[in-house]
């Protein structure tokens, strides 16, 4: 028997990369592998996605892990550098960076570097998280264009705040803001991440930045990734470690929050919130077992969950239980738990075993 295991399908990762190329055929791809490649393993995912044109990460530590692991293609720091001391590290490792603040601009202007850096100026078109405000953008751009430490021309990027929602006015406004500033400027342009790739082809521009879609998961509540021709790259599974007779009126788990209305059989699966499965998953959350869906009952424990197998079940100790994967999309689990698919796949803990299928 195996305890909690995440099986990563390399074929699915490659398929998804090619599917994104089909969706954005005129754009180059920044494969976003931040946060341990959304829980899929940073180096393994990056090497599998070697046909990408560039890799996107959030932290310098992630970029340096890629370089140490043999990745030679361009790497983009999506959050930018944090301190002036980071700049020589970017130069030495040929790392590109977003620049979104006056502090970063001043650091670039003041630095003495052995070579200039490829820079992406981040424009705040409406996310209001990082980026240069539109009324300050032209002056900021001109200073970057005059900076000896910046490879010319300056590239321009932004990020949609609501591309994953049915409401379109906000995204239209952001795109119009981006175009008003970027039109006629010679650098590369990028604004579309996963949601923009799938729903906003007019926003694809020179570069797109696929994140969660690379892993076969939709950025939307619906439709699911499979509806866009994507394949789930992660299967999270574990094993039944107990099968028990359960009487009507008996509860199960901490707090006795679920009480059976009938005589039934309960199974116990070796996975819990200590593995990253959400403790808040309510009774009724589906699990895939022996070709059918069964339901979680009672509270998720640190190391175990209980499921209602049904009174006539023939399931046995050692049977494999699938928490999400091809048969049970992670988007479905997200809908049942109220926790985004982004969180589900990135929250797996270090004790979950990682297995890789394919070369």
Swiss-Prot record:
Cofactor(s) in the UniProt record: pyridoxal 5'-phosphate
Keywords, ordered alphabetically: Isomerase, Pyridoxal phosphate
GO biological process terms on file: D-alanine biosynthetic process
GO function term, MF aspect, one: pyridoxal phosphate binding
Highest taxon above the source species: Bacteria
E.C. numbers: 5.1.1.1
CDD domains: PLPDE_III_AR_proteobact
Signal peptide interval: none
Pathway connected to this protein: Amino-acid biosynthesis; D-alanine biosynthesis; D-alanine from L-alanine: step 1/1
Name of a matching Pfam family: Ala_racemase_N
Residues carrying N6-(pyridoxal phosphate)lysine: 34
Catalytic activity annotation: L-alanine = D-alanine
The keyword Amino-acid biosynthesis belongs to this UniProt entry's keyword annotation: no
Annotated catalytic residues: 34 (proton acceptor), 254 (proton acceptor)
GO cellular component, one term: cytosol
SUPFAM superfamilies assigned to the protein according to its UniProt record, in alphabetical order: Alanine racemase C-terminal domain-like (SSF50621), PLP-binding barrel (SSF51419)
Family named by the database record: Belongs to the alanine racemase family.
Function as written in the Swiss-Prot or TrEMBL entry: Catalyzes the interconversion of L-alanine and D-alanine. May also act on other amino acids.
Protein name: Alanine racemase
Gene: alr
């Amino acid at each position: 028997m195996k305890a909690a295991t995440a099986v990563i399908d390399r074929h699915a990762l490659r398929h998804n990369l090619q599917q994104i190329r089909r969706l954005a055929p005129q754009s180059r791809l920044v494969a976003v592998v931040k946060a341990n490649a959304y829980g899929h393993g940073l180096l393994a995912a990056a090497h599998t996605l070697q046909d990408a044109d560039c890799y996107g990460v959030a932290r310098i530590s992630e970029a340096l892990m890629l370089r140490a692991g043999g990745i030679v293609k361009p790497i983009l720091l999506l959050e930018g550098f944090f301190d002036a001391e980071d700049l020589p590290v970017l130069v030495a490792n040929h790392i590109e960076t977003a620049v979104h603040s006056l502090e970063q601009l001043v650091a670039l202007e003041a630095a003495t570097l052995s070579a200039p850096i490829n820079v992406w100026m981040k424009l705040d078109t409406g996310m209001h998280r990082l980026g240069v405000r539109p009324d300050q953008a032209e002056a900021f751009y001109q200073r970057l264009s005059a900076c000896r430490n910046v490879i010319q021309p300056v590239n321009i990027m932004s990020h949609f705040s609501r591309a994953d929602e049915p409401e379109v006015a906000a995204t239209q406004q952001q795109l119009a803001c981006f175009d008003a500033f970027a039109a006629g400027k010679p650098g590369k342009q990028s604004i579309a991440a996963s949601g923009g790739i799938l729903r906003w082809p007019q926003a694809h521009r020179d570069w797109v930045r696929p994140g969660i879609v690379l892993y076969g998961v939709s950025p939307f509540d619906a439709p699911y990734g499979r509806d866009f021709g994507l394949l789930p790259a992660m299967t999270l599974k574990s094993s039944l470690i107990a099968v028990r007779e359960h009487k009507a009126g008996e509860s199960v788990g901490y707090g006795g929050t679920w009480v059976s209305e009938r005589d039934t059989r309960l199974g116990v699966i070796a996975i819990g919130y200590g593995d990253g499965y959400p403790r808040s998953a309510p009774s009724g959350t589906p699990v895939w077992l022996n070709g059918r869906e069964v339901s979680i009952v009672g509270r998720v424990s640190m190391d175990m969950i209980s499921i209602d197998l049904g009174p006539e079940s023939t399931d046995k100790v050692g049977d494999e239980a699938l928490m999400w994967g091809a048969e049970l999309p992670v988007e479905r689990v997200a809908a049942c738990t109220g926790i985004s698919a982004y969180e589900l796949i990135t929250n797996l803990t270090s004790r979950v075993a990682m297995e890789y299928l394919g070369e």
